[in-house]
Amino acid sequence: MEYRLELEHLKEGCPVMVTKLPKEILEEIVSWVKYGREIKDHPLFMLRKHENYGKNSYQLSVPSRMVEESFWLALTLRMTATLCGGHHRDYKIRKWDGHFDSYDVWLNFSYKGDHNPEHKHAGSLSGVVYCENPDLHSIYFPEYDVEFSGEPGTMITFPSHVLHEVKEQLTDNERVTIAFNIIRKDDAN
């Protein structure tokens, strides 16, 4: 069976793309979330915390071995080449060699009061995989006046320079997403 990548624009004229991930990749994602929960519940969890611009209750990088062995990585790099031009070998996940954050692929565990103010990312293409989103909490792209309430199993991608934000979460229900940044191989981190 051959997999056919189906991408849709979130809105006409908007560079945000949406795709539904195949079940085989969703199984990988479930294992990443399970791993993240184990670290989040560990007594030394704060040592592995991924810090960035936003406010999520807990963030941590997906281990490089899980990313490297995944079909998700192959799909995402092939999709990047389709969207940005060139060959999939022209792209890679942004990486921090020798650091516990390793790749720019991280889990976000969000609860009531969490939010991400308007920001952009480094790299060529960024994205979000929706793992759990019981209240369909949305990401907002102000330049295009469009929001997306990701259902589990969907992934969005957008040029890294596109401003976006996640408004304050108003419920106690856990929201779990995975964010990532992709760069051209010849670009610096």
Where are these regions (language model features)?
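Intrinsic structural disorder
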Residues: 1, 188-189
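Non-heme Fe(II)/2-oxoglutarate
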Residues: 1-97, 115
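Catalytic core of non-heme Fe(II) oxygenases with the double-stranded beta-helix
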Residues: 89-177, 181-188
